[in-house]
Amino acid sequence: MTRSRSVVVTGGASGIGDAVVRRFAEHGDEVVVLDRKPGNAAARYIEADLNDCSSIDAAVASLGQPVDVLCNVAGVSGASPVQLILGVNFFGLRHLTDQLVPRMSAGGAVVSVASTAGWYWRDHLDEVTRLVHAPDFAAGVQIGTESLANGKDAYTRSKEALIVWTSYAAQRYRGHVRLNTVSPGPVETPLLPEFYDSMGHEELDPLTELAGGRNGRPEEIASVVGFLASREASWINGTDIVVDAGAEMAFELGQAVPA
């Protein structure tokens, strides 16, 4: 019989995070949610603010047991202030992961939810690398706020940085844990209206059309997160998995929806 794993999920109170919590709980794993508010009753709850390093450190200290899987799902949209976007979506996530990985069991996994908004990281690699190699949370947020004009740009850059940093971190921690990202397109979550506000229907609607006329469901993203955290994904490391029904690639290639 497979032993139950200890799983930490950030942002587990709603949306994709809630679906991730339910997936692991249904498989008999012990789940701890780090969030600003309680969520699924199937999980233990620890209050944590990913925009505050001291809050992150306190949450890590409260775990009190080895961790097998970390799922970084918490995030804010481009409708939020630039500093908050950079803090929650990347620098807080990075701080939490760096604090937690040394406490993780060998053979564990870190899966972070990025976005197809980070698809073009290669086009901005110099700027992205500056964020990735920022020495700490405060310095990184300062670098980002000085160079990014609005929330939409900050959201994109935060997800680009997450994808690139994960590749670096996968090499740093290789042999101990695996790190990968999952990049959804538009997903039906409570946060989706904010994405329409910040990115516009003109940008998101074509992706929905190319995906077959609907947005993703939280459970469809959670299933990929669960796979990457499993032993079946043991040879996947430092990789970004796009989960958008092929929409971003179709858009990039200029393909029309078949009649």
Where are the regions that the model predicts?
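Catalytic loop of short-chain dehydrogenase/reductase
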Residues: 77-78, 83, 106-176, 186-187
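Short C-terminal tail/terminal secondary-structure segment
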Residues: 125, 237-259
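Short, small/polar-rich loop/turn modules that mediate ligand/substrate recognition or access, typified
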Residues: 176-178, 236-238
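N-terminal Rossmann NAD(P)H-binding glycine-rich loop of SDR-like oxidoreductase domains
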Residues: 13, 17-22
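A conserved structural motif in NAD(P)-dependent oxidoreductases
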Residues: 210-221, 232
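Rossmann-fold cofactor-recognition segment
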Residues: 40-54
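Short, flexible catalytic-loop segment of classical short-chain dehydrogenase/reductase
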Residues: 184-194
